[in-house]
Amino acid sequence: MAMMERPEVLETTGGKCWEHTFEKFRLKVYVPDNNLDGQVNNYGFRAPLLLVFEEEQQDMDSAVRFARESGLAKVAADSDSSVLFVYPTAEDGWAGAGADFYAAVIAEIKMIQVYRDGIVENYDFFAREFKGYFVRGAIFRADIYSFGKSADYVAKNLLTTLQGEYLWGPGEITPAMCSMERLSVLPDVRRKDIAVISAGNSEEINRAFDGCEHLLVKAEASYEADYYGFVKKFKMWCGRIEYEPDFPALNMTEEAGFVTVDTSPDNRSPFKDEKTHKVGYFAYYNNGISDRGPVPLVIGFHGGGDSSMYLTFVAGWWEVAHEHDFLFVSVENHQFVTATEAVQVIGELKKRYNIDERRIYATGFSMGSGKTWDLYQEYPEVLAGVMPVSALFPVYTSFFGAPVSERLNKTVPVPVFYSGGEKSHVPELPRQADSALERIQYVAEVNRLKKKFGEVRFEDRDSWENPLWGLSGDRTEQVPDPSRGSTLTIHYYDSEDGVCRTAFASVSEQVHECRKHSIENAWKFISRFTRP
């Protein structure tokens, strides 16, 4: 169950702390001080979820001392994270912890942008409903540290595929790494890809780990060194162990920054009464990219409940930027940023990087698609093209719900590659909602398509020429995605001047998500266009 009241946060040595007792476990959280401005640049997606399974329940002072002396506090501080100490509420401790204990822990952890002191606020944007406080953390980066009795529990119960509450609902919650010290039982290893640290264990126990794909055997744990040398690279994403990219090895740069913008009159976020506010971003580019002259810029906007790193790493924009040699800048907390302010960010980026002003593109997933559409309809002269994904927002209001009639673009064509999932539960395709059809009709009008979408009626969708879009493209292409067993079907629409600058695509078997296959095909189409 979520915490409906915010826990009391106390000052402690080198940071802050708080605690809470849930039904199945007691939790202590230590949030070490750091030099990062996590409210501007959100590091949560790549931050480790450091779970210390206490052998015996200890007080807060002892927990803080362990975090600091072990180096785990330093690991947490380096990524604006926390150290979590967990102990069962069962009367006989770990011996009484059931198989569902870990799922109960994970159910109280969420990765949401709005957070403070290691606590996130879960507010449903669409339902306008507060759903409680949760522990901040990335459950796909769960690193478990266990000792003696707690290690025995891990060895018997957690080295297997586990189900529970994942990011978007029920799903796999298998940990990325399990560290076990002073085991007294042979581990039951039913899954070989989980990263394992075996420290201070017998040769017999260590032999039981033979066959593990990611194994570090040590006489004694060295937590900070082990993290940076072994643990850091692992994440368990959607049931598969994956490696985080090593940007120096790839000859790439990942760079955090922010721009101070003048708050625009249409900003309805918590910054609406501030004269200025900060907009954070992370930039990704190949080293030496500017040596050959000005470079294309793709500015990206993440989905609701996500962060800039989600768009970068899950959608794979960093890989597309690496492979196709452009600058990718992912904006943080854009839900607090208007289109006017986003243009200010672009203006400042042009001062910091050698950007080709004729090749500036925008993209966004879900709620970030809404921000991309805002730029299309309010500032078309800035962009050479847009690549919104998985959301067809209403036309005549901004992301904040404010009318934009004064700035609504009606005359400036902007190249578009839009893609949506055929099995999504949100309006991603015209067939799914009349507001989605309205967006397509608007693009058709602005880009002056030969096909007359204005004649398409939502109520006639069962008899549409094309069951998803209403009208088929002048040309159609099907691009298989073998990695997901799906097909990207692209409809290309010609404008009245004979130029094809509009592509609407659907992805079979896709729900509400953003895939590298789709965005890379979007880039291949959009990158051909430049501003005059």
Regions found by a protein language model. Give the residues of each.
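A domain-start/cap signature at the N-terminus of enzymes
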Residues: 1-49, 97-108, 118-128, 140-166, ...
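Short substrate-entry loop that stabilizes the transition state in hydrolases
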Residues: 36-47, 52-95, 289-295, 300-337, ...
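Alpha/beta-hydrolase
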Residues: 52-54, 180, 301, 389, ...
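Alpha-helical scaffolding within the catalytic cores
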Residues: 65-73, 182-189, 309-318, 345, ...
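Conserved acidic catalytic loop of the alpha/beta-hydrolase fold
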Residues: 101-140, 341-358
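A conserved short beta-strand
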Residues: 164-184, 188, 381-396, 414-415
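Short beta-strand/loop motif that positions the catalytic acidic residue
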Residues: 196-199, 417-420
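Acidic catalytic loop of the alpha/beta-hydrolase fold
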Residues: 201-203, 422-428, 511-514
